[in-house]
């Protein structure tokens, strides 16, 4: 039995209706998926492309950085603007990676101001160093009064002049010797210091030569005069005692005088 054309016509619209309904359902599911993907993060998250910085859905910005040789991230905090979060990331990168760090901003972030106590101490130390290095003020040189003499400049010379001088050497002595038949007499004369100092050297040499010659002459004539002097002394002694050797009585009386007398010696002493 062949189907009728009316039945085929009714089945075709039914199939088209089922296909359209299924396509509409699939399109609705795809629309819900796109809406959820568009709702992640803040509205300005795609506007700023800073490393380690992202925006929350309520508008705040957060920053975090990956530590070296670790898979974990270090939380840096929440900030009001994207620039503040980027500066926080740059500071952390400099501390962790040093000069190899990749920074978000071209210029390095400014360092925090020092506390007031350390700033005051640094200012005080700088002022003290400046005061210590500064030279003391110079005083003007006043002219010296004319009636004052700088005696201290001549102190070494004055001390040299006040040193005791050695005593002058004794004056030379002149000797004159004379010889006679019985005795030899020697006289010594000392001329005044002024004459001795002024006398030339030739006079002193002549006096010494003459004195030496006279002394040698006296020594040569002394043995000859000794015998004659002894004979003369014996003759004078005999004349004084009056003894001629003729009478024995006179000879005995002469012996009395020749003996030593101890009592007489006491009186002589």
Curated annotation (Swiss-Prot):
The keyword DNA-binding applies. Residues 49-106 bind DNA. Keywords: DNA-binding, Nucleus, Stress response, Transcription, Transcription regulation. GO terms for biological process: positive regulation of DNA-templated transcription; response to stress. One of its GO terms (cellular component) is nucleus. Residues 1-53, 106-153 are annotated as: Disordered. Residues 107-117 have a biased composition (Pro residues). It is found in: Nucleus. One of its GO terms (molecular function) is DNA-binding transcription factor activity. Residues 11-22, 118-136 have a biased composition (Low complexity). Its main location: nucleus. Belongs to the AP2/ERF transcription factor family. ERF subfamily. Probable transcription regulator that binds to cis-responsive elements of genes involved in stress response. This is Ethylene-responsive transcription factor ABI4. It comes from Oryza sativa subsp. japonica.
């Amino acid at each position: 039995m062949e189907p009728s054309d009316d039945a085929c016509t009714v089945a075709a619209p039914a199939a088209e209706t089922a296909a359209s309904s299924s396509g509409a359902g699939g399109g609705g599911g795809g629309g819900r998926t796109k809406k959820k993907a568009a709702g992640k993060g803040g509205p300005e998250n795609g506007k700023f492309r800073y490393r380690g910085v992202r925006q929350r859905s309520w508008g705040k910005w957060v920053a975090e950085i990956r530590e070296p040789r670790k898979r974990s991230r270090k939380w840096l905090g929440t900030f009001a603007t994207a620039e503040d979060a980027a500066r926080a990331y740059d500071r952390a990168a400099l501390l962790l990676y040093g000069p190899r760090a990749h920074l978000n901003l071209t210029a390095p972030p400014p360092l925090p101001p020092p506390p007031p106590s350390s700033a005051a101490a640094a200012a005080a130390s700088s002022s003290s160093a400046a005061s210590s290095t500064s030279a003391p003020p110079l005083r003007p040189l006043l002219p010296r009064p004319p009636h004052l003499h700088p005696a201290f400049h001549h102190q070494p010379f004055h001390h040299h002049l006040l040193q005791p001088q050695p005593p002058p050497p004794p004056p030379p002595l002149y000797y004159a010797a004379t010889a006679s038949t019985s005795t030899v007499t020697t006289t010594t004369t000392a001329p005044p210091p002024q004459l001795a100092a002024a006398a030339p050297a030739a006079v002193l040499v002549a006096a010494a030569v003459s004195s030496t010659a006279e002394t040698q002459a006296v020594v040569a004539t002394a043995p000859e005069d000794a015998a004659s002097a002894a004979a003369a002394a014996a003759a004078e002694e005999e004349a004084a005692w009056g003894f001629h050797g003729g009478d024995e009585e006179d000879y005995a009386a002469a012996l009395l005088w020749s003996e030593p007398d101890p009592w007489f010696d006491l009186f002589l002493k």
